[in-house]
Amino acid sequence: MSTSSSALSQLKNSPLAGNINYEPTVWSRADALKVNENDPTTTQPLVSADFPVMSDTVFIWDTMPLRELDGTVVSVNGWSVILTLTADRHPDDPQYLDANGRYDIKRDWEDRHGRARMCYWYSRTGKDWIFGGRVMAEGVSPTTREWAGTPILLNDKGDIDLYYTCVTPGAAIAKVRGRIVTSDQGVELKDFTQVKKLFEADGTYYQTEAQNSSWNFRDPSPFIDPNDGKLYMVFEGNVAGERGSHTVGAAELGPVPPGHEDVGGARFQVGCIGLAVAKDLSGEEWEILPPLVTAVGVNDQTERPHYIFQDGKYYLFTISHKFTYAEGLEGPDGVYGFVGEHLFGPYRPMNASGLVLGNPPEQPFQTYSHCVMPNGLVTSFIDSVPTDGEDYRIGGTEAPTVRIVLKGDRSFVQEEYDYGYIPAMKDVQLS
């Protein structure tokens, strides 16, 4: 049985969301053909190869600022807090020494995902981050990998819900509750001891491991809909169906120009932005809903989706890679976005193509895992920056922050700031 985006459009009487009736927005091949990697208004400034490193002992990548459910980035008692996916560097480990006994940082960096742990950092300045350590002690998380999610400050008592991804074996959206304690000297995240798995891919809307061994299901980002006041969550998924069974039909093609009708093996790229709704604001019980955006025949990854609510519009951002595009399409590593007037859509690709902020062609892998904040600031990490010839320098550290301006369906890169500059939008004083 073949699967297409249109197969997901159906009336659903949701026990938690009520009677809903929406069709996923299709990010079409015609949309993606408009991607322009050389547009300066959607291109991140070049990162210098002499960038500073925030730690000599750990790599960091996906960065998750502490925030509230409306997206506001917060500090607590004057301390800004970020969480990062983190892995130890191994400069003295024989496993990562080359034939000449030199540290092979490239191989160490490439292996990081298998040992990813959630760690936290704190700062008085919104930069100059101080390493706090692990969020969860070893053995608390039920799987071998701790992958990205969202830390939510719940109240002025310091309670925090960390939504994250439990990976290997399987992949599940999970939550763990703890608290933040501050002093004049620093910050502690404490009591993150009881992990609750919330849901896994269902095989009806979202592809499972049984349907595709290289499936994607991760990156929870909860939020309160400013219109109906309910708690929802977006996440990365793939459209359900056996690998290779999907159809790239007329909707997925869009109005392509002559010569672009042949899609080759594009049926294998089936990314989507998923949606779930909570029973109540406690976030303890969730129901999976159909995807909001599908990318069948366009791209296989729609990582770390998240919202900004501005001027009565829903700005839905995601990140994706050059290498996950389908055959016949090309785009940079970076931020992609969709905008609409209602949570359930329909959405329009921003800047006509979907591209919001891409790496420059001369440094295609300089940054990744961007997070767009409500103040327009965008944080990311440095992956690799070219140096001499074909060589490059590994990052594993925070990239320079940039600001984008949103105007209707369009976006513009406007300013660049210091490395890892993630200022709070509001300070919460604990009671």
Curated annotation (Swiss-Prot):
Activity regulation statement: Sucrose hydrolase activity is negatively affected by salt concentration. The levan polymerization rate is constant regardless of sucrose concentration.
Keyword match Chloroplast: no
GO annotation terms (biological process): carbohydrate utilization
Induction of expression: Highly expressed at the end of the exponential phase of growth.
Site (Transition state stabilizer): D219
Listed InterPro entries: Glyco_hydro_68, Glyco_hydro_beta-prop_sf
Misc: Strain KL103 contains two functional levansucrases, Lscbeta and Lscgamma. A third copy, lscalpha, is non-coding because of a premature stop codon. Lscbeta and Lscgamma show different sucrose splitting and polymerization properties, and differential expression, suggesting two distinct roles in the physiology of the bacterium.
Quaternary organization: Homodimer.
Protein name, per record: Levansucrase Lscbeta
